[in-house]
């Protein structure tokens, strides 16, 4: 592993090494390991999530060493550098026609892919549903038993290297047409109602107490979140700016599905 990292780091500093077959082989091995789930762009530790920047470098370097190839699927034709993921049956993944995942994305057993898209470097945990027209961007990290509802957009990130990927932790529910980008971290068992938009600068305001509590870039565990707005002064007057409101907490329960249904009913959250 350390040798792979050294080769990638050297090629990052000196792009002429991309002509070297040993370098190309090392980069492709890193992408193959991402595809198998033996490497991850980001991973949880006892001290929080860490981002493996050298692996992101390998993904970026993978593009210039790949040649364009035509891919034919029945009457459809594609022309790209990155091969498609294969072997879904042996991996225990259900894939509905028109769903697409790129090689270099790890998809665990029990995942259901409706017509959707998962990009290179992404990680999707066991039992997760990727619903119709949902997209999982490059290097995004999706936990176990997550529900990405129809039209959800999970942002990807390759560059800048220091930028963190979007992280959606285990048992979270992301409602229809939600957008989560710019390295936002949604902690375990959170519920985002339909149309919530979260960027790195979006104010996430907990309104459940006597005084509002503001977060940015992070949704605390088990939070129930809906779209909101707040007044902001501009030269032309006062206007409402979008934000996200934490309106309650999903109750802890060993039965996560029951807990989710209760939260949706209790807070009248559109999904």
Model-derived segments and spans:
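Structural signal for interior beta-strand "rungs" in well-ordered beta-sheet cores
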Residues: 93-233, 246
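Terminal amphipathic alpha-helical/low-complexity segments used for targeting or macromolecular assembly
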Residues: 1-93, 222, 227-271
């Amino acid at each position: 592993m350390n040798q792979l990292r050294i080769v990638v780091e050297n090629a990052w500093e000196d792009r002429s090494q991309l002509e070297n077959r040993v370098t190309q082989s090392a980069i492709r091995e890193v992408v193959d390991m991402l595809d198998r789930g033996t490497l991850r762009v980001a991973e949880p530790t006892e001290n929080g999530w860490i981002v493996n920047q050298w692996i992101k470098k390998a993904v970026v370097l993978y593009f210039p060493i790949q040649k364009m190839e035509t891919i034919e699927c029945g009457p459809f034709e594609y022309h790209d550098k990155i091969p498609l993921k294969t072997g879904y049956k042996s991996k225990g993944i259900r894939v509905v026609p028109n769903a697409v995942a790129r090689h270099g994305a790890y998809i665990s057993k029990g995942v259901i892919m409706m017509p959707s898209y998962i990009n290179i470097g992404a990680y999707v945990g066991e039992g997760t549903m990727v619903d119709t027209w949902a997209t999982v961007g490059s290097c995004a990290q999706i936990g176990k038993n997550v529900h990405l509802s129809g039209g959800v957009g999970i942002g990807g990130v390759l560059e800048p290297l220091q930028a963190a990927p979007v992280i959606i932790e285990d048992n979270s529910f992301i409602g229809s047409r939600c957008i989560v980008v710019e390295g936002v971290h949604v902690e375990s068992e959170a519920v985002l109602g339909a149309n919530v938009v979260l960027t790195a600068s979006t104010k996430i305001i907990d309104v459940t107490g006597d005084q509002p509590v503001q977060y940015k870039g992070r949704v605390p565990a088990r939070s129930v979140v809906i779209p909101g707005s707040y007044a902001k002064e501009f030269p032309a007057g006062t206007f409402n700016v979008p934000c996200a409101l934490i309106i309650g907490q999903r109750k802890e329960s060993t039965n996560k599905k029951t807990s989710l249904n209760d939260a949706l009913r209790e807070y009248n959250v559109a999904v």
